[in-house]
Amino acid sequence: MTATNKQVILKDYVSGFPTESDFDFTTTTVELRVPEGTNSVLVKNLYLSCDPYMRIRMGKPDPSTAALAQAYTPGQPIQGYGVSRIIESGHPDYKKGDLLWGIVAWEEYSVITPMTHAHFKIQHTDVPLSYYTGLLGMPGMTAYAGFYEVCSPKEGETVYVSAASGAVGQLVGQLAKMMGCYVVGSAGSKEKVDLLKTKFGFDDAFNYKEESDLTAALKRCFPNGIDIYFENVGGKMLDAVLVNMNMHGRIAVCGMISQYNLENQEGVHNLSNIIYKRIRIQGFVVSDFYDKYSKFLEFVLPHIREGKITYVEDVADGLEKAPEALVGLFHGKNVGKQVVVVARE
């Protein structure tokens, strides 16, 4: 039995900001069966995740970025995190009807071979399935690992989160508040700033686009300095943060979205503060911490069910909307976690 299979194809390697014209939206056919003698599963993709790291994979293969993930192959569907339902299985640990989240191609149907720390069976369905693209998936685990494992927070510390209304930042802020920290976030619009203060419980927030002097803005928000910085932006923001860090401050480098579309990345000028203030800066990738995923679920699920942790999604309906949604991410058009709905069942 065959079915039509819509796909989002990368035309060629991307330079600068991606545009919708960098992608083709095509329709092909797929055999609705698993190849004999394999451990593969056939899945119907339900939700797809738009994430900043995907821009890195759109560029030409590079030894540095290869340490994070392989570049996409032009002419093939792009890949990312998604939520899928199994419709046929050749894998002993998965059966028809099971739900999983993990890496899939941007298409309606995919044949995948589930791998440890790349695909996870969904056991808890009393929460929105789309949460497994965000709050309960890679971004949520990123926030948890980066804050607790990398930053080693203590009650009463000051925490700054950039890109704070995004998929990762909105959870980092809530985790920090639960720790008894003083939390400030930045975002790129009044709507997002209001969200940080009214929805996510940040103590303060500011629109970085309205600040002519980021160093002064941070000094205003943190008159006694910053203990922890959760880095999602890079560039000028990192420069301003370094001046405002406290002694023995910690910086968890999760992302640098301000740099991904630049031909020549911006330099950072205030690095001497790392020495003077004994600042610890650590880059991290969420896959290094997936062995703690079950611990993460045990921690976060009760808080979600009790309404102590909330999450905002920006939902695009239909696979044909996926290129627009992904491109919009790099212009700050999304409010909250950007999700693409391929199918709800």
From Swiss-Prot:
Database matches in SUPFAM superfamilies: GroES-like, NAD(P)-binding Rossmann-fold domains
EC number: 1.3.1.-, 1.3.1.74
Chief location bin: cytoplasm
pH dependence: Optimum pH is 8.0 for 9,10-phenanthrenequinone-reduction. Optimum pH is 6.5-7.0 for azodicarboxylic acid bis[dimethylamide]-reduction. Optimum pH is 6.0 with (2E)-hexenal or 4-hydroxy-(2E)-nonenal as substrate.
MF terms in GO: 2-alkenal reductase (NADPH) activity; 2-alkenal reductase [NAD(P)+] activity
Classification via SMART domains: PKS_ER
Catalytic activity: an n-alkanal + NAD(+) = an alk-2-enal + NADH + H(+); an n-alkanal + NADP(+) = an alk-2-enal + NADPH + H(+)
Cysteine disulfide partners in this protein: none
Annotated positions binding NADP(+): 52-53, 163-169, 188, 192, 208, 232, 254, 260, 284-286, 330, 334-336
Keywords of the record: Cytoplasm, NADP, Nucleus, Oxidoreductase
Induction behaviour: Up-regulated upon treatment with paraquat, t-butylhydroperoxide, diamide, and menadione.
One Pfam family here: ADH_N_2
Tissue specificity field: Expressed in leaves.
Compartments, as annotated in UniProt: Cytoplasm; Nucleus, Nucleoplasm
Inhibition and activation profile: Inhibited by N-ethylmaleimide and p-chloromercuribenzoic acid.
Binding site for substrate: Y53, Y260
One GO term (biological process): response to oxidative stress
Coiled-coil regions, chain positions: none
Top-rank EC class of the record's enzyme: oxidoreductase
CC per GO annotation: cytosol; nucleoplasm; nucleus; plastid
Summary of the function given for this chain in its UniProt record: Involved in the detoxification of reactive carbonyls. Acts on lipid peroxide-derived reactive aldehydes. Specific to a double bond activated by an adjacent carbonyl group. Can use both quinones and diamide as substrates, but not menadione, ferricyanide or phylloquinone. Can use 4-hydroxy-(2E)-nonenal (HNE), 4-hydroxy-(2E)-hexenal (HHE), (2E)-nonenal, (2E)-hexenal, (2E)-pentenal, propenal (acrolein), 3-buten-2-one and 3-penten-2-one, but not (R)-(-)-carvone, n-nonanal, n-hexanal, (3Z)-hexanal, cyclohex-2-en-1-one or 12-oxo phytodienoic acid (OPDA) as electron acceptors.
Subunit structure: Homodimer.
Family membership noted in the UniProt record: Belongs to the NADP-dependent oxidoreductase L4BD family.
Name of the protein in its database record: NADPH-dependent oxidoreductase 2-alkenal reductase
